[in-house]
């Protein structure tokens, strides 16, 4: 993402923190696909402040359909940009305790303020079964400006939409695998040249073939029809996708 685009995103975040609670979705091909097939999930994605493009292919899809230029600003990138700022109090929630411990250990080196911030392991359960009042009570007591959520899509987006009504303040951002990338324990993000070449999906397949092959096969099988349907909606003035 360009510096100008990043500044716009961070300006919106800073402005919202003073207004109240809200959330940002970081949209990749999986989220785009589910949102176009599940009206309730689409409402969740469109119900946040805005969405940013996680996948390098999402801006290409949108350019093909709408003829507009969109920029990629992936979850792991905005995550590290905000951590490096040393500007906000943050709350980290999701994933396993081992990953959270590794994440905290590594982030303290980059931002010493992280040592005094909260890392909360969410129990493994259906998204409808969380005690959102109790979770919000923890976050509100903490006074966090930024709440990082790592539960994986589509669960994390639904989680944020359900938690929002109980929060007094804070911008929630769903960052998926970013916790794992920076914990030093599990999968790492692809090298920069791989990302720029739009080959990150191949890197992820090599690192985790069982999980990623299934996801990629599903996207490849459904994407052509999805793009054509959205193209027709756009030309009929009935697009389901808000501007990202």
Q: What annotation goes with each model-predicted range?
A:
Residues 1-5:
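Short, small-residue-biased leader/transition segments that mark boundaries at the very start
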Residues 21, 88, 167-171:
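A short helix->loop->beta-strand "cap" motif at the edges of active sites that frequently abuts
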Residues 29-31, 151-156, 178-179:
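Short glycine-rich anion-binding loops that position phosphate/pyrophosphate groups of nucleotides
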Residues 59-60, 189-243:
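A transmembrane-helix-recognition feature enriched in membrane-embedded lipid enzymes
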Residues 59-138, 142:
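Conserved beta-alpha
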Residues 104, 157-166:
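Short Gly/Thr/Asp-enriched flexible loops that form oxyanion-binding sites at enzyme active sites
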Residues 122-127, 170-205:
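Short, flexible loop segments at boundaries between secondary-structure elements
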Residues 139, 143-148, 153:
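Proline-aspartate-enriched helix->loop->beta-strand connector
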């Amino acid at each position: 993402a360009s510096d100008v685009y990043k500044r716009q995103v961070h300006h919106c975040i800073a402005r919202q923190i003073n207004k109240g609670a809200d959330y940002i979705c970081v949209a990749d091909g999986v989220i785009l696909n589910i949102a176009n097939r599940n009206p309730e999930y689409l409402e969740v994605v469109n119900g946040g402040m805005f969405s940013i493009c996680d996948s390098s292919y999402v801006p290409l899809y949108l350019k093909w359909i709408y003829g507009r230029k969109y920029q990629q600003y992936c979850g792991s990138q905005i995550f590290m940009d905000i951590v490096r700022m040393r500007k906000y109090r943050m709350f980290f929630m999701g994933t396993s305790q081992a990953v959270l411990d590794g994440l905290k250990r590594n982030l303290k080196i980059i931002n010493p303020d992280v040592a005094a911030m909260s890392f909360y392991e969410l129990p493994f359960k259906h998204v409808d079964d969380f005690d959102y009042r109790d979770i919000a009570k923890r976050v509100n007591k903490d006074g966090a400006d930024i709440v990082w959520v790592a539960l994986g899509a589509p669960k994390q987006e639904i989680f944020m939409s359900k938690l929002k009504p109980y929060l007094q303040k804070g911008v929630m951002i769903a960052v998926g695998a970013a916790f794992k990338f920076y914990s030093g324990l599990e999968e790492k993000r692809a090298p920069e040249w791989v990302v720029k070449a739009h080959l990150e999906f191949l890197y992820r397949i090599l690192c985790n073939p069982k999980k990623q092959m299934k996801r990629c096969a599903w996207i490849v099988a459904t994407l052509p029809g999805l793009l054509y349907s959205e193209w027709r909606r756009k030309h009929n003035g009935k697009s389901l996708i808000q501007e990202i």
